[in-house]
Design a protein with these regions (language model features):
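Sec-dependent bacterial lipoprotein signal peptides
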Residues: 1-18
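Ser/Thr-rich, Pro/Gly/Ala-heavy low-complexity intrinsically disordered linkers and tails
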Residues: 15-126
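N-terminal module-boundary/linker segments of secreted carbohydrate-active enzymes
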Residues: 114-168
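Substrate-binding cleft and catalytic face of glycoside hydrolase catalytic domains
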Residues: 137, 170-320
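Noncatalytic carbohydrate-binding groove/subsite architecture in carbohydrate-active enzymes
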Residues: 276-381, 388
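Aromatic/acidic polysaccharide-binding cleft in carbohydrate-active enzymes
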Residues: 352-429, 436-442
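Carbohydrate-binding surface patches
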Residues: 441-483, 516
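C-terminal beta-strand-rich structural cap/linker in extracellular carbohydrate-active enzymes
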Residues: 502-525
Length: 525
């Protein structure tokens, strides 16, 4: 298959002239009114198949966008559109490694950045009709972060004796979020908190013997046909009180909890899923008990964390129809086991709420779980979720596990490439960055998304090349462009390796994407 040798990329830059040399990963503080816009994410090829296993019970159906593997002539394109509106501010202390911390408060969407019609120090060129356009004035969703779960993973082990690999913005992937399980120890969360990581909690089987403080109901059958209790019908206030006590205890040990989920996969009956709710029951549990309890201690409520995109709409509609629950839920979330990319729900953003993907195990590709084929599938899944569903946050399943389920393979004792391609997003598109619209026609097998720091105007471009050969790109930067683009490459032999700076001359820069790679280009403001 013919692979186009190059394609242009237009970046409509902000009014402030960008000067070279500042830290491109410092999200800074955000303080702005609501803003909204629509746009699209360019490119896409879904590579590989997924299944994997989860401790939540048995084999998983494939994650979104499965196919036969990375092919040399992979093709396809994807675009996402939607509106986003939010307000708030972002602030956080510096992380342990000296890099920027995850925001500890809301990072709201700021006012639309103005566009400079003139040319900056490095500008002066003209756009071409075949170019990809990155329009930084067309703001999409605010990025909250990227992370994984430590549920059932125990305390620090050989994987986390070097926590820098997970959370450092200078030595590792710079993950910014951690999902922990109600009832687990806090060892991993304490380590993550040292880096300014946003920690939040999910109950598995609320009210069961697996959740501290609840009665042993594992032999009971609830109205939905699953073993377990229905707290909203039996012990709702007691359960809410237990959750409050657990959150307060975590805070006293140095782990502030950002949000609490109503339940893990309320639509499933997995072996570790001992509480199932109908959509109406979950909304009632939130509106009557969980919402008021969390509001009293300043912790956000998340729901419904369904298994996939097929289950999400029914629960979302039930919460939307329950005035109390709708007012209590700040974050809507789902897992992504089968059933494709999560649906776009513009009413979430327009109501000042956030939309997260909170679990998926993308599994192995052609029997390989540690290398680039599976990593490219994961990167494409992130790209599709961010550009099509306008998600604010994205999570993989386990931090570490045997087989294909963790970012660290405890069998082979290696960090999977999946961790490093997550780092292509998380280390650079920091909490408070805003995705901006992209349009055009990237080469076959290439997907491009872009992000901007509304304070410093640093630009981050993530390019995925799923082809088995290198692919050229010609970036065209209009307005007041950055003077340089610094590439950070993850490929078969590199893990977030910094390359030589690319000079932007007459608004243009030419680059080559290595075969089967994810490269982040950082525009130094």
């Amino acid at each position: 298959m013919r692979i186009r040798s190059s394609v242009g990329l237009v970046i409509l830059a902000p009014a402030v002239v960008l000067a070279c040399g500042s830290d491109p990963t410092d999200a800074g503080s955000l303080d702005g009114g609501a803003g909204g816009s629509s746009g699209s994410g360019s490119g896409g090829v879904s590579t590989g198949s997924s299944g994997g296993t989860s401790s939540e019970g048995g084999s998983r159906p494939p994650a979104s966008g499965s196919s036969s593997g990375v092919a040399g002539s992979s093709s396809g394109s994807g675009s996402g559109s939607g509106s986003s509106s939010d307000a708030g501010s972002s602030s956080g202390a510096a992380g342990r490694d000296g890099g920027p911390a995850a925001a500890s408060a809301d990072a709201g969407l700021v006012q639309t950045v103005g566009v400079d019609g003139g040319s900056g120090t490095c500008g002066g060129g003209a756009a071409q009709t075949s170019d990809i356009t990155i329009d930084v004035s067309n703001l999409q969703q605010t990025i909250r972060g990227f992370g994984c779960s430590s549920a059932w993973a125990g305390n620090l082990n050989d994987a986390t004796n070097d926590p820098d690999t997970l959370w450092s913005t200078t030595k590792g992937a710079g993950l910014t979020m951690l999902r922990i399980r109600y009832g687990d120890g806090l060892g991993v969360a304490k380590a993550a908190a040292q880096y300014g990581v946003t920690v939040w909690m999910t109950p598995w089987g609320t009210g069961s013997s697996g959740a501290p403080g609840g009665p042993d109901t594992t032999t009971q059958i609830n109205p939905n046909g699953c073993k377990g209790s229905m707290p909203v019908l039996t012990n709702g206030q007691d359960l809410a009180n237990n959750l409050v006590s657990w959150v307060q205890n975590a805070k006293s040990q140095g782990v502030p909890i950002y949000a609490v989920s109503a339940e893990n996969e309320p639509d499933s009956c997995g072996i570790n899923q001992t509480t199932s709710y109908s959509p109406g029951q979950l909304a009632a549990w939130i509106g009557s008990y969980l919402g008021p309890a969390m509001s009293n201690i300043g912790v956000k409520v998340m729901a419904p964390e369904t298994q996939n995109a097929c289950g999400f709409p029914g629960y979302f509609s039930a919460i939307q129809s329950n005035a109390a629950a709708w007012g209590d839920v700040s974050i809507f979330a789902s897992h992504e086991y089968g059933c494709g990319t999560l649906p776009s729900e513009p009413s979430i953003a327009s109501s000042g709420k956030e939309y997260w993907e909170t679990e998926v195990d993308t599994g192995a590709v052609n029997g390989d779980s540690d290398g680039m084929p599976s990593a490219l599938h994961l990167a494409q899944t992130i790209h599709d979720d961010l550009t099509k569903a306008n998600l604010n946050a994205w999570h993989y399943w386990w931090l570490w596990a045997g087989g294909t389920s963790g970012l660290y393979d405890t069998t082979t004792k290696v960090w999977r490439k999946a961790l490093w391609v997550m780092g292509n997003f998380s280390r650079f598109a920091r909490p408070g960055y805003v995705r901006v619209s992209t349009s055009g026609n990237p080469p076959s097998g290439v997907a491009v998304s872009a992000y901007v720091n509304p304070s410093s105007h640093a630009m981050v471009i993530v390019a995925i090349n799923s082809n088995s050969s290198s692919t050229g790109l010609s970036f065209f930067v209009s307005g007041s462009p950055p003077c340089t683009l610094v590439p950070w490459e993850t490929s078969a032999n590199k893990n977030l390796a910094m390359g030589s700076s690319v000079t932007v001359s007459s608004s243009r820069a030419s680059v080559t994407l290595p075969a089967q790679s994810v490269t982040t280009f950082v525009g130094m403001p």
